[in-house]
Amino acid sequence: MRVVDRGYNASTMKATRKLRSPRVLIVGCGDVGMRCVRQLQGRARLYALTSHAERRDELRAAGVTPIVGDLDVRASLARLAHLAPTVLHLAPPQKTGEVDTRTRALIATLTAPRVRRARHVATGRLRRAQHGIRARKTSSIVPDGGYPAPRAGHRPSRRSRVVYASTTGVYGDCAGAWLDETRPVAPANERAKRRVSAETQLRRAAARRAITASIARIPGIYAGNRLPLARLEKRTPALVDADDVYTNHIHADDLAAILLRMATHGRPSRVIHASDDTTLKMGEYFDRVADAFGIERAPRIARDDAEQQLGEMMLSFMRESRRLVNTRLKGELHVRLRYPSVDDFLRTVSKP
């Protein structure tokens, strides 16, 4: 890693300074997580939580120490406690409910007090003295308000720095308006409400100084292996221009670089739009991809027809229109994207 005066160039895939600790834990090490691994290769001790034991060999081959655990099973997460000061939380919430119980379990694990073994075996006299001290105390149960304030001069364990991969779906439909990170959230479905829940839990944990948290709100992720080619080949329709919605995008490699940049330079409790400069409607995006690969463009239908023909998941994206301002990304993190727009990436694609 090297320090540069003018910020971070994502095309080099190198952070501008070392992470505050060489140990990094990735929770949810899928496609984007593995891209983070490649960008950190040889510059940090990497750990990854996986719920799939069969992935252990793959992770080890990538230079990652696998930890088998499940965010839905709190007891399986014990090894994560105090493992790494830097945590990339890339795991999605569970599929039902409005509260993200997975993030709740992770925060509880990361903030669990250290358990230290006694150095000496107490003598009978010492045990009696300890018993007398305990007898003079009131209840030792920690109240709901949290743990007592540390004694003067006491140095608490170092807090975990958590970078959370959230979604721009927390804003709901904005009717195509431009918005920055100060826009109030208005989640329109349970999926987005769980993301708001995760953000809120992390902010509250940070407010009580249990962790340090930064939040990336992420739009549609694309890459060579994440393009809507199958959708185009199936001739799935898009909306006519009059009914179409604005979408936002980020290349997966640029996203990985942004997350790592946030781990070293992100302001505490700060939200960042991890978005490129693309301003396209959804159908226009599909057309650009189709043209780049020599595929026939998607047919267009009216919204009323789409409501009858398409599945609920796809429709949920077609009901929300917004355009993201990414000034913080550039002004605070000084990120220079490798692919500032979808078109910049598609120009690198060879037509068949």
Question: What positions do the PLM features span?
Answer:
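NAD(P)H-binding glycine-rich loop region in Rossmannoid oxidoreductase-like domains
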Residues: S51-T109, R117-R119, T123-R128, G132-S140, ...
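Conserved Rossmann-fold NAD(P)-dependent oxidoreductase catalytic core, especially the SDR/UDP-sugar
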Residues: I107-R127, R134-D144, P150-E190
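Catalytic helix-loop patch of NAD(P)-dependent Rossmann-fold dehydrogenases
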Residues: A175-I215
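NAD(P)-dependent short-chain dehydrogenase/reductase
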Residues: N189, R203-T247
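Glycine/proline-rich active-site loop of Rossmann-fold NAD(P)-dependent oxidoreductases
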Residues: V196, R209, I221-E233, R261-I272, ...
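Mid/C-terminal beta-alpha module of Rossmann-like enzyme folds, strongest
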Residues: A256-M314
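Conserved C-terminal active-site "lid" loop/helix of NAD(P)H-dependent oxidoreductases
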Residues: E307-R336
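Amphipathic terminal alpha-helices
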Residues: P340-P352
